[in-house]
């Protein structure tokens, strides 16, 4: 028993919140331990607030942590004795992961290889089926009495015995979501379908082009593939931007050796995946197809955009390109930037639960709150590594994050004061006083690779003229956009002004300074992507500046973004700009 307060950093509270003292001697190691099973909620200057949630504990359980590990971490770093209910709550919550196990039905071992068939062509009795195993008599009765589950689950008629439920294979995803809503995550150990063979090998190059797998990349692939044992082959890998998530995806493709669908954020990312595959694997160019608005070519390795999959003529029509997902015998689906997976795509993924699914992301946070859908339909977190750990080992650049709070002039303050709430957001974002700050920062970092990133086109046009820099927006033709990116990589262009198109999957390894002049209402996703643009390993440190209008809603939004960076381990300074 801890008879008196000590210098440990955690204060664990009975409501499952944890206060973390940033000034305590073991703050950093406590933060890393806590990040494996809790979520950061608030990050003021002295005390950070984390929360332990059922989903955070289930992700921890899926990654191999047990309740004893969680409680031991809390006890080790806690300043006071744990509230007496905490060990019980942790144990009870984590025990729910695995209480329900999805397995192949004995009579459907062969049929389970046929997951892509349209269930509408069969009767309910003939459709491939799975067994939901439940060894808890009370939970079994709870499921039996739940009329809402009756449309998908029926008492099993197999020899497996009492306590099991039968379900159609096509309902696999839906049942996982419905039971998670009721507080019971399913451990899915049912068979995964084998796709058509597509063997590829990594090509490590020679001389200046030589490269090798980093230890954490190899660990990530092993954690996903899992020796192809039951319960492996699906899930999410969480790695920082700039740490080589694309290489992890390609290594997973090589390990599985089957036809692969890669879904990513935009056409530029499609092209980048193609270039990486051709540079780092032995795949023949003709084996790679693009499925976008401009080109629709399905090959053994097909790269598509989220936009094309969610396109439909009108809101009452079906999504015509979903048929491509259902029809092809994919052995692996890779969802790049999985935190951006559009809600309509979840519907298709729910029907493809027999296909291996790999999610790649820098953050599990979704702005729409659908983290539970990712957990159910893509899979639990299989591997993650803190940004700061990779930074210390030199795998990504050391970054300095600074929020600069800038006053508004009298005219802008008056306009802001009388504006409606929505208008306040844009007025604060387009504060003209930010221009001198951006110009000063650009001059200070002259000669370095600088990205000025913003939300509003009119504002970006003004900054491009002020800085004498090229502007890239969604309206920039693809060939012009690619030419400017190439010039930046070659060092011929040292400063780019870019809109949100630069947030996702663009490889600009020489960028070392990012100046954010406006953003997406405090999006933590966006902060991860923007910081990631400057985190590629390089000789000099990287700098991330966020320009915020003082005494405005932008300060509130900045708090949301700041929380994400602190969660990842970055020291975050706040400075007030006075001319």
Task: Describe each model-derived feature in a short phrase.
Residues 332, 339-400, 565:
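Post-DEXD/H (motif II) to motif III coupling segment of the RecA-like Helicase ATP-binding lobe
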Residues 497, 506-519, 543-546:
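A short beta-strand element within the Helicase C-terminal
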Residues 271, 287-290, 451, 458-462, ...:
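Conserved helicase ATPase core of P-loop NTP-dependent helicases/translocases
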Residues 416-455, 461-462:
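Conserved interdomain hinge at the start of the Helicase C-terminal
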Residues 364, 521-544:
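Conserved SF2 helicase motif VI
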Residues 230-252:
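Walker A/P-loop
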Residues 268-294:
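Conserved helix-turn-beta segment of the N-terminal RecA-like "Helicase ATP-binding" lobe
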Residues 1-114, 118-199:
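Extended alpha-helical interface modules used as scaffolds for assembling large macromolecular complexes
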């Amino acid at each position: 028993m801890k008879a008196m307060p000590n210098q440990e950093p955690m204060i664990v509270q009975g409501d499952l919140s944890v206060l973390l003292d940033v000034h305590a001697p073991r703050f950093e190691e406590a933060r890393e331990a806590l990040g494996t099973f809790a979520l950061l909620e608030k990050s003021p200057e002295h005390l950070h607030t984390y929360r332990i949630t059922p989903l955070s504990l289930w992700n921890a359980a899926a990654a191999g942590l047990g309740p004893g590990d969680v409680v031991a971490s809390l006890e080790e770093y806690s300043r006071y004795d744990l509230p007496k209910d905490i060990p019980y709550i942790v144990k009870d919550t984590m025990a729910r992961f695995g209480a329900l196990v999805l397995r192949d039905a004995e009579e459907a071992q062969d049929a389970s290889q046929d997951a892509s068939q349209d269930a509408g062509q069969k009767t309910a009795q003939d459709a491939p089926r799975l067994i939901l195993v439940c060894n808890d008599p009370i939970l079994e009765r709870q499921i039996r009495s739940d009329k809402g589950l009756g449309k998908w689950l029926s008492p099993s008629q197999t020899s497996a015995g009492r306590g099991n439920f039968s379900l159609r294979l096509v309902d696999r995803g839906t049942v996982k979501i419905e039971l998670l809503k009721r507080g019971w995550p399913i451990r899915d150990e049912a068979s995964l379908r084998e796709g058509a063979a597509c063997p590829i090998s990594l090509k490590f190059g020679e001389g200046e082009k030589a490269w090798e797998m980093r230890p954490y990349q190899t660990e990530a692939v092993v954690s996903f593939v899992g020796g192809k044992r039951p319960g492996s082959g699906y899930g999410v890998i969480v790695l920082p931007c700039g740490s080589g998530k694309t290489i992890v995806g390609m290594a997973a493709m090589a390990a599985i050796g089957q036809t692969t669908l890669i879904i990513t954020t935009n056409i530029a990312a499609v092209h980048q995946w193609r270039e990486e595959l051709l540079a780092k694997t032995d795949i023949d160019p003709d084996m790679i197809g693009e499925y976008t608005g401009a080109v629709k070519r399905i090959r053994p390795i097909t790269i598509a955009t989220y936009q094309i999959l969610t396109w439909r003529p009108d809101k009452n029509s079906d999504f015509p390109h979903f048929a491509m997902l259902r029809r092809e015998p994919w052995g692996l689906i890779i969802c790049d930037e999985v935190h951006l997976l559009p809600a309509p795509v979840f519907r298709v993924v729910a029907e493809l639960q027999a296909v291996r699914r790999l999610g790649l992301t820098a953050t599990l946070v979704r702005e729409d709150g659908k983290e539970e859908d990712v957990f159910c339909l893509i899979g639990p977190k299989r591997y993650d590594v803190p940004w700061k750990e990779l930074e210390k080992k030199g795998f990504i650049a050391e970054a300095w994050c600074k929020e600069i709070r800038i006053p508004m002039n009298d005219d802008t303050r008056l306009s802001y004061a009388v504006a409606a709430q929505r208008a306040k957001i844009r007025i604060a974002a387009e504060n003209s006083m930010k221009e001198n700050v951006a110009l000063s920062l650009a001059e200070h970092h002259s000669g370095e690779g600088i990205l000025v990133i913003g939300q509003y086109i009119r504002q970006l046009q003004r900054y491009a003229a002020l800085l004498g820099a090229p502007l890239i927006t969604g309206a920039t033709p693809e060939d012009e956009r690619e030419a400017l990116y190439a010039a930046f990589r070659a060092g011929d262009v040292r400063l780019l002004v870019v809109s949100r198109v630069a947030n996702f999957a663009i490889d600009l390894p020489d960028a070392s300074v990012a100046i954010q002049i406006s953003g997406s209402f405090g999006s933590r996703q966006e902060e991860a992507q923007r910081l990631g643009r400057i985190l590629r390993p390089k000789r000099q440190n990287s700098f991330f500046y966020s320009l915020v209008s003082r005494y405005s809603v932008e300060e509130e939004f900045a708090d949301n973004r700041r929380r994400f960076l602190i969660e990842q381990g970055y020291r975050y300074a706040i400075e007030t700009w006075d001319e």
